Amino acid sequence: MLRLINKTINKNDLIKINNSKRFCSTTTNSTINKDNIYDIIIIGGGLVGSTMACSIGNNNTTKHLKVALIESSKIQTVEQSISNAIPEIRTISFNNQTIELFKSINVWDTIKSTKRVNPFNQVRVWDTSGFEGIHFQDNDIIDDGNNTTAMGYIIENNIVTSSLLSKVKQFENIELFEQLSVKSMNDYNEETIRTTSILPSVTLSNDQQLHAKLIIGADGGNSILKKQLQVPSIGRVYNQKAVVCTLKLGIKQDNNNNSSNNNNNNNNTLFQRFLPTGPIALLPLANGYANIIWSTNLMHAQYLLELDDESFLEQVKDSFLKSPSTSNSSFFEIASNLFNLNPKGLSGNEIYLPPIEGLVSKRASFPLRIDHTFNYTLPRVCFIGDASHLVHPMAGQGVNLGMADVKTLSSIIEQSVQSGYDIGDAMMLKRFEEIRKPENLKMLLSIDTLFNLFTNNSIFVTGLRNFGMSLLNNISPLKNLIIGVSKGESILKFK
Amino acid sequence: MIYHLISKSCQRLNKPNLINNLIKSQKQSIIYSSSSSSGSSKFISNKYFTTTSNSNNNSNNTTTTTTTTLRQDEIDFFNQQSSDWWNPEGTMKPLHRMNPFRVKYICDRLKIYNEKVSKNPIHLPLEGLNVIDVGCGVGLLTESLSRLGASKVVGLDAAKNNILMAISHASFDQKLNENIQNKSLNYLESTIENFYNIENDQQFDAVCSLEVIEHVDNPKQFIDYLSKIVKPGGSIFISTINKTFLSYISAILGAEYIFRMVPVGTHHWDQFIKPKDLESYFDSNNCQITDLKGLVYNPLTCEWDFTNDLNVNYLLHAIKK
């Protein structure tokens, strides 16, 4: 123990030596001076990281904190992000809680001003069993400028990110490190950080060294920080890929509904069909575009990527509208009659899908997995967003969970400042973990269960599933509850 | 001599970890006294040691001297607890969780009653204030007060191990380390009466004594001393546990025996105090209670919250006229 103390003292001496060296040598990268000590370093300037930065900068209690935001890619301006009329391939479904957060940090107006924001108020979910499926419908979208009641919003990733980062640039205490990544964590040692006044530091790809009281890892599912610190996590690979692309939709010939006010922009329904190979979803975008996210097995994904545009479109239409195959289901029919699984005898064609005009983007794909980190925090380190919890995109909740992390962590940091705590205080960070972990795990497990349920084709499971769905579809309080959940509202309130 | 004392007390406690911690804190306090000038070493010298610090022999001392507000067994108890005190998941977890709430309460109240505080920047509300934390333990509240910018903070505790742990812990934080060096943060091993007798010119803008008075033998006298060291117009903050049936159920049976949140023997119900009694003590010292607020703990979520129910834990703010 005594030796340990000696060691610490030596380290302190070393720092002093380094400091004195500064005056006689030109290599100043490894020295600690006031300039490279930050209160908070946020690694990753994506949706979650940049919202975190805005959230700190926009709060009167925390705006004095010196923040470094490190983003590895080149940052686009808002103008650049909307320069292409065709929407970007990566789109996100934001729930109302996230929109509220955007409003509170004053970026919602910027995002809305791009006119590339599309609210949706209907969700149609069905599967291949020929059953009617489930139809969620919220109130009509009322937009009086301040209050919009929609179930959620579909917006392109880069529009939101660039709006957030343009806001970040307005805060004087936030420094943006563009096109730089984290090279190393410089012998980060939990024990040393916990029991001495030595702050952790990161070395950037340009060999610049930054020290901070708190390092926030917001660098996504493949977090470099997590790898550097060898933080363990569990999860599984779904053996699936999501194939994504952008479509242009045709104009609806909806004669029955002439009285509707928003005939021009009737693109407010989110469609999702659970195929035996995985879910396919059509997310409506502004200006008559739509985004397809098609999760399927690796072979099929490869096949879909290699098809020419026309055949691919055929496949998309088929997958949404094709009747259930009855070839192998004589037993299914018996069971179906017995349990009255399909009382209306629907084929699936009744689901009204907007006409698809054409493909306007290349197809891309990304692998799907679920992952959860047990420790959201280490001494003076905290993970938020996909860095600590990764989900299947089928429920569109990944980013929204990350935003809920941001909300909680910023209020914890605010409390730390108000109550005279170090912002990297272990107990305060632990409180963040205690609040967020149950919420995130709940969502992770629900989505994983849904995935298992819907990719299962056994009669028992389909029967159960459809029975459940028909129940759901006919019991309105229950349905309202689910709409509430999908909007991100908490059902159980303890206070 | 100090070293000898500690190792002796550690042997008595039969805790091998404790001795290491203490050697460490001892070592660090030596670093302080040697690195800074004689002024800082004053605080860890024997000047403030009470007669009770040589604990083995004179445990009867307290009953014979009229000026002592503390019982020796209480000091011994907290001497034992000091090693695990700074562990936020340890035996003092509820206290750790309570701290952010009580700090916020203190700042909010001072904002109303102290002009300086209302004009200070949000993150340094206590700038320009002299504050004392009587019964600081290992410095939970003291550290917060120092970080919030108070120009002078004194942490006072009669248990020597607590003071050593407090000094050691402050060295983990660069800002607090600086504050100790420039003497805006001071830890003293002393009882309130000794402190008053030696430094009777000290006048504080705020006197805090949180979760302390229920461990004090003579609360009336304790309040007398607190009122003596506060400036006219200054604030006194007390938090404690009410003497009710419910407080017996929750603070003794619940917290110590059922949930095992705090060590058995932490509290003694007969030493709990009713707000009414405190009011009369304050009255006789020309102080007025301006606010009373209840605090409630949820053992499942480990979170505190404010309430209007004063039956168990409560906080109060008094002003000296």
UniProtKB/Swiss-Prot annotation, chain A:
Its EC number is 1.14.15.45, 1.14.15.46. GO terms for molecular function: 2-methoxy-6-polyprenolphenol 4-hydroxylase activity; 4-hydroxy-3-all-trans-polyprenylbenzoate oxygenase activity; FAD binding; oxidoreductase activity; oxidoreductase activity, acting on paired donors, with incorporation or reduction of molecular oxygen, reduced flavin or flavoprotein as one donor, and incorporation of one atom of oxygen. It comes from the Eukaryota. One of its GO terms (cellular component) is mitochondrion. Pathway: Cofactor biosynthesis; ubiquinone biosynthesis. InterPro entries: FAD-bd, FAD/NAD-bd_sf, UbiH/COQ6, UbiH/COQ6_monooxygenase, UbQ_mOase_COQ6. It is a peripheral membrane protein. The keyword Lipid metabolism does not apply. It catalyses: a 4-hydroxy-3-(all-trans-polyprenyl)benzoate + 2 reduced [2Fe-2S]-[ferredoxin] + O2 + 2 H(+) = a 3,4-dihydroxy-5-(all-trans-polyprenyl)benzoate + 2 oxidized [2Fe-2S]-[ferredoxin] + H2O; a 2-methoxy-6-(all-trans-polyprenyl)phenol + 2 reduced [2Fe-2S]-[ferredoxin] + O2 + 2 H(+) = a 2-methoxy-6-(all-trans-polyprenyl)benzene-1,4-diol + 2 oxidized [2Fe-2S]-[ferredoxin] + H2O. It is found in: Mitochondrion inner membrane. Keywords: FAD, Flavoprotein, Membrane, Mitochondrion, Mitochondrion inner membrane, Monooxygenase, Oxidoreductase, Ubiquinone biosynthesis. Its main location: mitochondrion. Component of a multi-subunit COQ enzyme complex. This protein may be expected to contain an N-terminal transit peptide but none has been predicted. Belongs to the UbiH/COQ6 family. FAD-dependent monooxygenase required for two non-consecutive steps during ubiquinone biosynthesis. Required for the C5-ring hydroxylation during ubiquinone biosynthesis by catalyzing the hydroxylation of 4-hydroxy-3-(all-trans-polyprenyl)benzoic acid to 3,4-dihydroxy-5-(all-trans-polyprenyl)benzoic acid. Also acts downstream of coq4, for the C1-hydroxylation during ubiquinone biosynthesis by catalyzing the hydroxylation of 2-methoxy-6-(all-trans-polyprenyl)phenol to 2-methoxy-6-(all-trans-polyprenyl)benzene-1,4-diol. This is Ubiquinone biosynthesis monooxygenase COQ6, mitochondrial. The lineage of its organism: Eukaryota, Amoebozoa, Evosea, Eumycetozoa, Dictyostelia.
UniProtKB/Swiss-Prot annotation, chain B:
O-methyltransferase required for two non-consecutive steps during ubiquinone biosynthesis. Catalyzes the 2 O-methylation of 3,4-dihydroxy-5-(all-trans-polyprenyl)benzoic acid into 4-hydroxy-3-methoxy-5-(all-trans-polyprenyl)benzoic acid. Also catalyzes the last step of ubiquinone biosynthesis by mediating methylation of 3-demethylubiquinone into ubiquinone. Also able to mediate the methylation of 3-demethylubiquinol into ubiquinol. Keywords: Magnesium, Membrane, Metal-binding, Methyltransferase, Mitochondrion, Mitochondrion inner membrane, S-adenosyl-L-methionine, Transferase, Ubiquinone biosynthesis. Pathway: Cofactor biosynthesis; ubiquinone biosynthesis. Its cofactor is Mg(2+). Pfam families: Methyltransf_23 (PF13489). PANTHER family: METHYLTRANSFERASE (PTHR43464), UBIQUINONE BIOSYNTHESIS O-METHYLTRANSFERASE, MITOCHONDRIAL (PTHR43464:SF19). One of its GO terms (molecular function) is 3-demethylubiquinone 3-O-methyltransferase activity. SUPFAM superfamilies: S-adenosyl-L-methionine-dependent methyltransferases. It catalyses: a 3,4-dihydroxy-5-(all-trans-polyprenyl)benzoate + S-adenosyl-L-methionine = a 4-hydroxy-3-methoxy-5-(all-trans-polyprenyl)benzoate + S-adenosyl-L-homocysteine + H(+); a 3-demethylubiquinone + S-adenosyl-L-methionine = a ubiquinone + S-adenosyl-L-homocysteine; a 3-demethylubiquinol + S-adenosyl-L-methionine = a ubiquinol + S-adenosyl-L-homocysteine + H(+). It is found in: Mitochondrion inner membrane. S-adenosyl-L-methionine binds at R102, G135, D157, L210. Belongs to the class I-like SAM-binding methyltransferase superfamily. UbiG/COQ3 family. Component of a multi-subunit COQ enzyme complex. It is a peripheral membrane protein. NCBIfam families: UbiG (TIGR01983). This is Ubiquinone biosynthesis O-methyltransferase, mitochondrial. GO terms for biological process: methylation; ubiquinone biosynthetic process. GO terms for cellular component: extrinsic component of mitochondrial inner membrane; mitochondrial inner membrane; mitochondrion. Its EC number is 2.1.1.64, 2.1.1.-, 2.1.1.114. This protein may be expected to contain an N-terminal transit peptide but none has been predicted. Mg(2+) binds at E211, E214, H215.
